[in-house]
Amino acid sequence: MDQKQIEEIVRSVMASMGQDVPQPVAPSTQAGAKPQCAAPTVTESCALDLGSAEAKAWIGVENPHRADVLTELRRSTAARVCTGRAGPRPRTQALLRFLADHSRSKDTVLKEVPEEWVKAQGLLEVRSEISDKNLYLTRPDMGRRLSPEAIDALKSQCVMNPDVQVVVSDGLSTDAITANYEEILPPLLAGLKQAGLNVGTPFFVRYGRVKIEDQIGEILGAKVVILLVGERPGLGQSESLSCYAVYSPRVATTVEADRTCISNIHQGGTPPVEAAAVIVDLAKRMLEQKASGINMTR
């Protein structure tokens, strides 16, 4: 699927929902326009917030021959470029930012989604067989199965045999859920209903792994299961969400190749609203083709 197809899908789904189509961000230098002046090299400072946009745009190369080239390179990527060196070593600010980003990524793995937040969203909360974060990190197999209490809750409180079942799980990034939830779930549910699909009761799974959607789909009899789960964070990016969609999942027979994945959902990657529109179109195609993953015709 190329960019034009994605834009057409987003435009169609958003129009059917009666919402404005998000406009693409204008490039920094348009044809015929004068390029912006290069930003000066920022002096190292202990007072600088290492998580700020200013710190991310910092250029540590002293006395560059072409400062404008470095500025344009820095704008074009989130990679750690143009940080300069102090002899054979990284400069102090570059090292401190690396450590700060690593700490932020570690924090989002270890943090918990607050129970108050889940209640505020009006979501039913269930758990996998995991009881705490440490066990979640060391026993991924237990995160693939629902607890007995969760199974009973789903059978008693959720819509059975839906066309599409949407599930939210913390995964390996708490920030991915709390930061993107309001911009992806409401338009996703609205788009699915607008498409005339029977949507199940959305709920939150604490300590869930991707394969837990197979058991959920089997219990509820869902034709398509959509799991929104926090991705393993990278350095400096702790808010990335993934969508794993699967058709008619079964615990015993569904394999990873049966899933269709849309990753890198966040404001710096695929915008959540745009991702919601693409997921709606994906669910419709899965129901039409009665397949998912590598079994779908392109």
Curated annotation (Swiss-Prot):
InterPro entries: EutC, EutC_C. It is found in: Bacterial microcompartment. Transmembrane segments: none annotated. Its main location: other. Its cofactor is adenosylcob(III)alamin. It is an enzyme of class 4 (lyase). Keywords: Bacterial microcompartment, Cobalamin, Cobalt, Lyase. Coiled coil: none annotated. Binds between the large and small subunits. Pathway: Amine and polyamine degradation; ethanolamine degradation. GO terms for molecular function: cobalamin binding; ethanolamine ammonia-lyase activity. The keyword Lyase applies. One of its GO terms (cellular component) is ethanolamine degradation polyhedral organelle. PANTHER family: ETHANOLAMINE AMMONIA-LYASE LIGHT CHAIN, ETHANOLAMINE AMMONIA-LYASE SMALL SUBUNIT. Catalyzes the deamination of various vicinal amino-alcohols to oxo compounds. Allows this organism to utilize ethanolamine as the sole source of nitrogen and carbon in the presence of external vitamin B12. Belongs to the EutC family. The basic unit is a heterodimer which dimerizes to form tetramers. The heterotetramers trimerize; 6 large subunits form a core ring with 6 small subunits projecting outwards. This is Ethanolamine ammonia-lyase small subunit. It comes from Salmonella agona (strain SL483). The gene is eutC.
